[in-house]
UniProtKB/Swiss-Prot annotation:
SUPFAM superfamilies, A to Z: Thioredoxin-like (SSF52833)
PANTHER family with a match to the protein in the record: GLUTAREDOXIN-LIKE PROTEIN C5ORF63 HOMOLOG
Xref: InterPro entries: Glutaredoxin-like (IPR008554), Glutaredoxin-like_YDR286C (IPR052565), Thioredoxin-like_sf (IPR036249)
Keywords in alphabetical order: Disulfide bond, Electron transport, Transport
Annotated Pfam families: Glrx-like
Originating species: Saccharomyces cerevisiae (strain ATCC 204508 / S288c) (Baker's yeast)
Domain of life: Eukaryota
SS bond partners: C31-C34
Family indicated by similarity: Belongs to the glutaredoxin family. YDR286C subfamily.
This protein's record includes keyword Electron transport: yes
Protein name listed in UniProt: Glutaredoxin-like protein YDR286C
Amino acid sequence: MLRAFRCSIHTSRVLLHDAGVKLTFFSKPNCGLCDQAKEVIDDVFERKEFHNKAVSLEIVNITDRRNAKWWKEYCFDIPVLHIEKVGDPKSCTKILHFLEEDDISDKIRRMQSR
């Protein structure tokens, strides 16, 4: 399971089409909290209420040179999850360190209703 996560951490991926809510997950390799947080995010997307919903996920490896801005911002705070309404950067809400399924789900629902 860890190996699959390591591969996906270097790329971004869209989980569902026609994104209305964008999740951006900031993490790095060899981070136990990041691995746990990724599992929580996966569990959220397995919920029936989010099937066929407009939600996307981008995974950002903050140790990648191209992501130096995010390293400076979050090197001591990962994992971090941004949840925002697509096209409205001011709507961004952040969850740092520990992610909980219900908290993420509630925030996605709130963004969808905006």
